[in-house]
């Protein structure tokens, strides 16, 4: 399994926004068929409503992600983006892993397929949440909710 610390159930998937990811996975032979299917399920679009109310969208994302079993020590932090190009949906626009270190937390992320992974050290989880919130705050548009952060299956509220 490509993500050893997350149990991914067999769910219906909507991988329509994952064409770039799946192309890179196929070209790089990154995953076998089973792992690619799990990837597509975890990062599926989630249906939502036409509202700018982040609470509404966060509740939908919490419900979706509650079907997965996450590791509490290696936390999946996700930036969730609202999209209305083909119906109202939510998708994980960026993801990284947060792990405790001796004097804080280490956040590991990959910004693009072409760039190497990067690791950033934070004193607190909240500092990492703020970093993500600030970095992705403009990934929105007119009539759309602002991006929000999920820590495993829980909405991070500031």
Annotate the PLM regions:
Residues 1-81, 92, 100, 104-105, ...:
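Acidic/His-rich structured neighborhood in mature extracellular/periplasmic domains
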């Amino acid at each position: 399994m490509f993500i050893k610390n997350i149990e991914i159930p067999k769910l219906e998937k909507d991988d329509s926004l994952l064409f770039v990811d799946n192309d890179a996975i196929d070209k790089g032979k990154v995953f076998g068929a089973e792992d690619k299917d799990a990837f597509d399920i975890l990062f599926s679009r989630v249906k939502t409503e036409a509202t700018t109310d982040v609470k509404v969208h966060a509740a939908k994302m919490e419900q979706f992600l509650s079907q997965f079993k996450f590791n509490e020590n290696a936390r999946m932090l996700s930036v969730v983006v609202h999209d209305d190009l083909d119906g109202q949906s939510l998708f994980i626009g960026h993801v990284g892993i947060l792990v405790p270190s001796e004097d804080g937390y280490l956040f590991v992320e990959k910004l693009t397929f072409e760039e190497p992974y990067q690791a950033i050290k934070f004193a607190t989880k909240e500092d990492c949440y703020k970093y993500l919130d600030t970095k992705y705050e403009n990934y929105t548009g007119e009539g759309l909710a602002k991006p929000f952060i999920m820590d495993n299956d829980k909405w991070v509220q500031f």
